[in-house]
Each structure stands twice: as C-alpha cells, then as structure tokens.
Amino acid sequence: VTRAWRAPAPADAQELDPGAVFEAGLRNHHVSNTAYPIAHGRTWAPYRVAAEDAAAVAVDAWAGIDDLCLYVHIPFCETRCSFCEYTVVKREEAPGVGEYMDDLRRELALYRAALGTESRRLHGFDIGGGTPSFVPAEQIASVVEQARSAFLFAPGADISIETTPRIAAAEPAKLEAYRRAGIERISMGVQVVQPDLLRLLNREANGIACHRQAVENIRAAGFARFNVDLMYGFAGQGLESWRATLQHAIDLGPEYVTLYRMRYKLTRISHQAAEVTLEQVRPLAALAKHMLADAGYTANPGKTTFSRLAGDVGTSSYLARRVQDGMPYLGLGLGAQSFTHTTISYNDGAVGKNLFPYHRSLERGRLPLQDLYDLPLAQMAGKMCAVSFYFGEIRTGPFRAKFGRELEEVYPAAVDLVLRQGLMRRTAGALSLTPAGAEQVNGVIALFFAPSVQRYLVERDPDGAEDLHRNRAASLRVAGEAALA
C-alpha cells in the first residue's frame, strides 16, 4: 500500500549516535519504555492539527482502512490506586455513569455515520479503564451490542474486559452477564499481595481475602481465558515479597499472567522513582520468568504476557493485532487514543481527567477530539516499534506492509548495533530480543524512537527532570477552561 506521510520537522530529520541513544535509554529507564511518545508537548508539537481541522483530518485518515481494532474506555474506579497513570475520574463523578455510557454510544454512532463502519472488519475489542466492571453490566452489554451492529467482527476477534478482585468476588451476576454478551476473556488486577504494599498503593479492598472467591465466580461464569495482572518495581519491594505474589498468582490457576513494571510517570507516587534502579528491577523480572516457566507459563524474552496454553499468545486479540501487526485502532471514551496509519489522536479528557469536555463535545454532536497529530513516518514507525516490545520483538512483515520499507532500511544503525552486540536476533519473521536484550530493553527500545524523542532522552537529566510528575497546574487549568467554555 502506498501512503503519504507528512514531511518530518528538522528535529526528526537528524541522526543521533546509536550508542549514545542506547545509554540514554538505560539512564532514563523510567521513561524509555512502551509508553510512546515521551514529552509529546515538545516532540510532537510541530505535528499538532488545529482544533477546527481535527475532525476532518481524523475522518480522512480512516479512509481505506478496512481492518481495525476497537477500545472503549471506562474511567470509573472504586478508588484511585497510587500507581495509576491512566485517565480515571474522581469518585465524586461516579453518579455520571449513566450519562457517560450514553455519551459512549453517541460517540460510536458519530463514527459509524462518519466512517461507514458497517463494512469495516473488527479484529479485537477491549473494554478497559479505570475499572469497566464498576458500571452496571447492562451498560457494558449495550455497548457490546452496539459495536456488533456497527462493525463486521472478523474470525478470531474476541472481546476482553477488566475487573478487580473485589468486584469479581462480590458481584458474580456481572460476570455472568459479560459471558452472555459474548465477552470471552477477562483480566483481573491482583498487582501485589503484601498488606503493607497494598495499603501504600490504596488497594486494601483488593487483598487476597477475596481472590479465591473471585476466581470461583469467574470460572462459574464460564470464562476459560483468564488473565492475572501483576506489578513489580515498587520502591521497597523485596525479592521474597515478589516471590510470594508470583506464587499466589500461579496458585490461582489463570491461563495467563501479565507482568507490568511500575512506570511512575504521572502517578501519585512518581517521587519514588529515584529509589528504584535497574539493578533492583532486573532480579525481580528474572525471578518472575523462572517461576512462571517452572509452572508451565511461557514467553519469549522481553514479552510481558506469559501463557500456559500452547499456541495462545495470552493477550486479547485487540492487543495482539496492535502489537504484532501495527493495526489501526479506534479509541472511544474519555481520553482514549486512536491510531491510524498516519495520525494519532487523544479524546477530550486526556489532560484534565474530568467528564465535562467529553460530554460537551458529544452533546454538540461533534467528535470529542482533544489533540490530533498528523505524523511523519519516523514518528509512526517509532510508535509501532515501541509497542512491539510488549511482545519482545518487531515483526518485519507487518512493518514492511505498513511503511513500504524494510526495518533495516529505516533503522540501519539501530539494527546493526542490536545484532552486533547480541541484544536482538533474527527469528522467523521478526527481530527479537535475546535474554541480554530483554535485560537492557530500555536502551534497546530507544534505538527505535524518532530522532526528536531520542534527542530528548540524550539531553534529559534523570535526577532533575520533572516529566515524571503530572503538571497539576496545567491539568487544573485545562479542566477549568473546559468548564467555562
């Protein structure tokens, strides 16, 4: 497919020394990860589309895209966990659940009318948050039904949803309703099991007391694809406490276990990042890989989801198609991100994290776009490569199909370095991390970022940088302006 990307800004036309970039990624390991881009207010500023043009550019960007995935964001939670970096609204806004779900349906209807979605094939559908299971089950079922009528579901496409242990244990009827609606995969956030750490993270209500009942209810509802999320890399998290968390998760018997390293950026505990070094994190990751392997869970080096089912990658089809194929995805809901071949956009609420601007846009019958970026190949390829590291490899066929160029042609110096230093190797249809590369993934991943992002990393001082911390003043200003508009 021939595509036209906009010309890069001067900052994305430069070439940096790959060795310096690799070292900068390791040095800035808390931000050099799959959460691409970094400092987008600076690195993506040249590509921001004027607000009055955003809707037209968004619709044009979807032209010719027949295969995509869908993500629906539910921003409500019982409590906000201290480690959360996502778009979650305050508990005081919970009474607005009904109105918000109406807005979601309005947004999907707008895209259906603008894009003619009925002829487009959906390859995966994730319902995330927040805590999707916080809202009434009939609201979830209604959104699923609307999505089924708006798109063609491709063979193999599944629907996945997230829950907390407490809700899964206390509200089994919700789980049964999800299965009736056709949701096949469920993910439960265990994260950690130590009481002191749960208290620190504001997750005491989701302690181990409710886990067994939660799993019983999940199985009784008919879920045969069950994932448990765990987190590591917290300040003060020792090897033995992590071992206990891993063993507990294994004993719950899920089909999949997904490991998330704590990223700190924009969280309530971002100030603790300085206490966590790579030397502390690596033994935790190694222990997890060994314990999960001994229990029958496998993953190639660097992959974050471990599966005990042969031939099953373990993730939802939404994430698999995003990561492995760079497939476009449409994001609905507060602050949701959408990705085409040439653009990335963020919905209203991505900054202020309040419902009003999102609701106002939909009430006025317009797409709720806060920011839309028309990006050059260097940035779109950087995004695709960055998320590929969820699976520990970059698939060369999908890269070629998307960009019309070989991976080695776009990244000659990066590919040379990772092969020469044994950080990645050529496998069937992919450039894959080696065990050594997985240990140094923060450096490896930076080699595939766009030059402006690499420059930012090279110049960034991890001890003095403020980008880990949410600019609260800016967030409040955006929220205030939205309320007055």
Predicted regions: what they are:
Residues 1-69, 118, 459, 467-485:
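Flexible, acidic/Gly-rich N-terminal and inter-domain linker regions that tether
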Residues 60, 91-113, 121-405, 460-470, ...:
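C-terminal scaffold of the Radical SAM
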Residues 64-102, 199:
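Canonical Radical SAM [4Fe-4S] cluster-binding loop centered on the CxxxCxxC motif
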Residues 70-72, 188, 433:
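Short beta-strand motif preference
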Residues 77, 255, 429-430:
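Beta-strand-connecting loop/turn residues
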Residues 405-417:
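Short amphipathic alpha-helical interaction segments
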Residues 419-429:
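A short, conserved structural fragment
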Residues 428-445:
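Accessory beta->alpha helical hairpin/"wing" motif in late/C-terminal subdomains of nucleic-acid enzymes
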